Each structure stands twice: as C-alpha cells, then as structure tokens.
Amino acid sequence: MLPFLIALQFLSSLPVSLPGMPAAREVGRSLLYYPLVGLLFGLLLWLASHLLQGTPAPLHAALLLTAWVLLSGALHLDGLADSADAWLGGFGDRERTLQIMKDPRSGPIAVVTLVLVLLLKFCALWVLVEQGVGAQLLLAPLIGRTAMLGLFLCTPYVRPGGLGQALAEHLPRRAAGWVLLCCALFCLLLGGWVVLLAVAVFAWLRHLMYRRLGGATGDTAGALLELLELAVVLGLALGL
C-alpha cells in the first residue's frame, strides 16, 4: 500500500499523507504503481465527462482539460517546458542541455510549447466529446504513466541524486516487466492502433534522450508523459 501512496503523492495533487520518509526500496517499488495512478486519473476524467454531459462541447472539453491539469498539479507540464527550453537552447551539447533544465525560469520556447500542447489536447478533447467519449478517456493517462515505468526500466538515469535515482536503482525489474505486459495487453484491447502509435512515439522520444543525454532525467520523463498523452488523444480524435 505504501508504494501506491508514494506514487499517488508524487504524480498527483490529491491530498496524500505518508507515515514518514519512505525508504529508497519503497520509492523504487512505487514505479510499479504508476499505471494504476494513470488508471485512476482516467476513471476520474471519465466520471467528470459523464457529469458534464449536456454541457456545450467546447466548455466540456475545456473543463476536462482543466481537471486533467489540476489532477497532476501541472508537474509534467513543468518537465515539458524545461525540456523544450533545454533541447533548443542546448544546441546539441549534453552538459549545456542539463544545465538549462535546472534553470527554474521559462523561456519563450517553453511557453510556445506549452500553449501548443494544451491547445492541441483541448481540440482533441473537443472532438472526442462530440463523438461521445467513454472508456477511451482511460487510455491517455494510463499509457502516459505506464511509459514512465517503461522509461525507467530501459533507460539510464543521468542526473545523480534525488528521487529519480532512487526510482531507477530500486525498481524491481522483473515485476516491472510483468506490469508493462499486462498494461500493454489491456491498452491494446481498449485502444487498438492508437497504442502502436504511442509505442512509436515512445521509441522516438527515448532515442532523442539517449542520443543527446545518454539517458533520461525527471524533466524528460515528464515531457515524455505529456507528449504521449497528446499523441493518444490526437490519435483517438483522428480515428486511429
């Protein structure tokens, strides 16, 4: 139960109280529960969409997106903004890229990236609302957080210290493989071709991280999640 609470506290803005400072082993095990947190997000969004039935589609989509951002506390959007600034401002240099990621200030590239991602997600949700969204709302949050588990399983963590290193070093790898397999089968049954799109986007983004940094950071993991969620809702809206 503790690893799930750790995952929920880290990935969401929901009020979660831990009994104390968790051990590194429990922090590593919390990664196994990231997909479950994603599923919980999806269920809450599905419920919100049901309660908003009858609302004009643009407002329905805007409120859904607002709930989505509030649930995560904009944590991963922050990672996306930092990664966007660093990727373009780093000019291909590893150390410069990592240094820019640590800068708390957001440049114009970060702002433009966030606006485009949120605009595209809003438009995709608008289309899905008009089509009658249902169980498909489970997919994007679930795939996004499952991808974080997959990233830490198969990609070195390049920034020493902190939560990310504890996650990477203490992740139970065999159990993680089984969790990924079960999630993949569930998502394939629910989403079909859009899951293959998500896998392709994951592989491409991981390749970019590995080529530039030699691995992943917390910021790039957050960027991965946001871009995968966007890819999934766009794929669903386009009828893939």
UniProtKB/Swiss-Prot annotation:
Record's bilayer topology term: Multi-pass membrane protein
Sorted alphabetically, the Gene Ontology cellular component annotations on this record are: plasma membrane
What reactions does this protein catalyze?
A: alpha-ribazole + adenosylcob(III)inamide-GDP = adenosylcob(III)alamin + GMP + H(+); alpha-ribazole 5'-phosphate + adenosylcob(III)inamide-GDP = adenosylcob(III)alamin 5'-phosphate + GMP + H(+)
Q: In which pathway does it act?
A: Cofactor biosynthesis; adenosylcobalamin biosynthesis; adenosylcobalamin from cob(II)yrinate a,c-diamide: step 7/7
Instruction: List each coiled-coil range.
Output: none
Q: Which domain of life is it from?
A: Bacteria
Kindly list the residue ranges recorded as spanning the membrane.
31-51, 57-77, 109-129, 133-153, 185-205
Per its UniProt record, the required cofactor names are: Mg(2+)
Reported EC number(s) for this entry are 2.7.8.26
Gene Ontology biological-process entries: cobalamin biosynthetic process
Location relative to the cell: Cell inner membrane
Keyword terms of this UniProt record: Cell inner membrane, Cell membrane, Cobalamin biosynthesis, Magnesium, Membrane, Transferase, Transmembrane, Transmembrane helix
GO molecular function annotation: adenosylcobinamide-GDP ribazoletransferase activity; cobalamin 5'-phosphate synthase activity
InterPro entries to which the protein is assigned, alphabetical: CobS (IPR003805)
> Is Membrane included in the keywords of this UniProt record?
yes
Entries under PANTHER family matching the protein: ADENOSYLCOBINAMIDE-GDP RIBAZOLETRANSFERASE
Its function, per the record, reads:
Joins adenosylcobinamide-GDP and alpha-ribazole to generate adenosylcobalamin (Ado-cobalamin). Also synthesizes adenosylcobalamin 5'-phosphate from adenosylcobinamide-GDP and alpha-ribazole 5'-phosphate.
Family indicated by similarity: Belongs to the CobS family.
- What this protein is called in its record is Adenosylcobinamide-GDP ribazoletransferase
Species of provenance: Pseudomonas putida (strain GB-1)
